């Protein structure tokens, strides 16, 4: 038996099929993964993501400490509620984890992946020496992600007028604290939506309110196909400690300026650039019948081979799609080996669908 969120019994009551995910027993779907996927693209759905790790960071050195720890620069978060995405790198530039960091009134809040919890906390503790900084894990909090074009509208209708007004005013990648609730306009689906971090003892009642308002409970299966269509990396598949942001379509998340900010991994990344980045993360589209899966070999004629990192059937495109790490010189065509046979695939930018629009 794995760890369970406070909503586990409610998930079962709603008909969830559960699976192990990073040591947690989590809902895979509540009957139909494909229906949940389409519901989020067209309306909205709610995901329990309380298995993720919330870490509050405070102290007089909180900013300079995070400026050293993260590839992105928290100095860009000039107001409480502002958020940014960042890789957390090792000395060689490999990705220990990827996370969201929010500016709070007194410091910062990090939301990291569930499966990386132990190694992230060990890394933070190791890098704490010499800094006046404190960090606290918050297992008392629940996290619900309400995602889809009607998410903000439907959630606002359930809240007090004052809290609803805060939601309507939120810009993308901004959050706001309201009492013991923190509401952010962020997500992992490629749609508009909210991620709400709030006291766990209120989780069951609020989840029931959301479902009662017609917001579909949605599982990790739909979350995975939604994020894949959106070209969002999954830690442990598309990114890990053996690959850098430069080979993972995450170069945009590195803040190189100011040049004197010597964040952990900077030297390794600069060395990779100096020697020439050898690989890139691309999207693949299979035009024939079949399913692209992780670890299938990608062959690029006259250039070399790569590997699929994530692959699945796309409910929006009605085709199989994938993310793959391939040689840098790869053009717009390649082949994938499926059960001993080679199939042609189209190579595209690794973003297939965003905000309901097909981009390929």
Swiss-Prot record:
Oxidoreductase as UniProt keyword: no
GO molecular function: aminomethyltransferase activity; transaminase activity
Keyword line: Aminotransferase, Transferase
Record flagged with keyword Transferase: yes
GO terms of biological process kind: glycine decarboxylation via glycine cleavage system
Enzyme Commission (EC) number: 2.1.2.10
GO cellular component: cytosol; glycine cleavage complex
Assembly and interaction partners: The glycine cleavage system is composed of four proteins: P, T, L and H.
Family: Belongs to the GcvT family.
HAMAP family according to UniProt: GcvT
Protein name: Aminomethyltransferase
Organism: Pseudomonas putida (strain ATCC 47054 / DSM 6125 / CFBP 8728 / NCIMB 11950 / KT2440)
Name of the gene: gcvT
